[in-house]
A protein has these predicted regions:
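Catalytic NTP-binding/metal-coordinating core of nucleotidyl cyclase/transferase enzymes
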Residues: 2-76, 124
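A structural signal for short, well-ordered beta-strand segments
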Residues: 8, 58, 102-108, 181
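Conserved S/T- and glycine-rich ATP-binding loop of Class I adenylate-forming
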Residues: 12, 106, 246-248
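Alpha-helical scaffold within the catalytic cores of cyclic-nucleotide enzymes
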Residues: 32-48, 64-104, 108, 129-140
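Cytosolic regulatory/linker segments at or just downstream of nucleotide-handling modules
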Residues: 111, 134, 142-199
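N-terminal pre-ligand scaffold of iron-sulfur
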Residues: 199-247
Length: 248
């Protein structure tokens, strides 16, 4: 296993237990499978992965592959999820006479990533306090009467690119101090990393890893890309990249 800084998203269906009791079992499974399939597509498109399902809730992670800007991509996925659920609300109300909605919580922090399980049945798992915090941020939506909240640690990563609808001060479960959580309504600009496979320019394929203006003249910065350490150098306004000390 290894320790990574991840953007973690916890998503839960509002009042699903009483909702599921209204419907035949095959309708419940159909709704859940359709919902999970569409959520997985949105998360994958933004560079994340659903890591675990807990009943009608799920945990998604961004940054396992060491791509940058994980909080922005995670928040973008959350906003797209809410938009998709708004469409599902009408469909499920018309076809099943149920009120369908979700709550989303996002946190950014360190977590342990590794294979867990018995022999022959191991899977990639994420454990640690950050997972618990993401879950508690999601739960705080109920008290705040919101749909999407992100922790202060997550907000710091995107504060100059996020539009805040409101913020709340709450005591998260297990904490004696109040935490500030932010309700995000919109993101500005776009992610610093492309979620497409590659960018084709000047006859070559390139990976977008950061904005060029963020690297000042004379600066150096190490980044991880596809499990390789890349050294970026800006000198006389010319950009160079070094991998294993070999410039390319």
């Amino acid at each position: 296993g290894s320790t990574k800084r991840l953007a973690l998203m916890f998503v839960d269906i509002v009042a699903f237990t009483p909702l599921s009791e209204q419907l035949p079992s095959y309708d419940v499974m159909y709704i859940l499978n359709r919902y999970f399939d569409d959520m997985g597509t949105i998360i994958k498109k933004n560079g994340g992965d659903i890591n675990n399902f807990v009943g009608d809730a799920f945990l998604a992670a961004f940054g396992i592959d060491d791509k940058i800007d994980s909080v922005y991509r995670c928040t973008q996925a959350a906003l797209e999820i809410l938009k998709d659920v708004d469409v599902k609300k009408e469909v499920f109300l018309d076809n099943y006479n149920i009120n369908f909605d979700v709550r989303v919580g996002i946190h950014y922090g360190e977590a342990i990533v590794g294979m867990l399980g018995n022999a022959g049945n191991q899977r990639l798992s994420i454990i640690g306090q950050s997972v618990n915090i993401a879950s508690r941020v999601e739960t705080a939506n109920k008290e705040a009467e919101t749909r999407l909240l992100i922790s202060e640690d997550a907000f710091k990563e995107i504060e100059d690119r996020a539009e805040v609808e409101d913020f709340v001060r709450v005591k998260l479960k297990g904490s004696s101090q109040r935490s500030t959580l932010y309700e995000i309504s919109k993101l500005k600009g776009q992610s610093l990393v492309s979620t497409d496979k590659k960018i084709f320019e000047s006859g070559m394929f390139w990976d977008k890893i950061m904005l060029s203006e963020d690297l000042k003249n004379g600066d150096k910065k190490k980044v991880n890309l596809n499990e390789k350490e890349i050294l970026l150098v800006r000198n006389n306004n010319s950009l160079s990249a070094f991998s294993n000390l070999c410039p390319h």
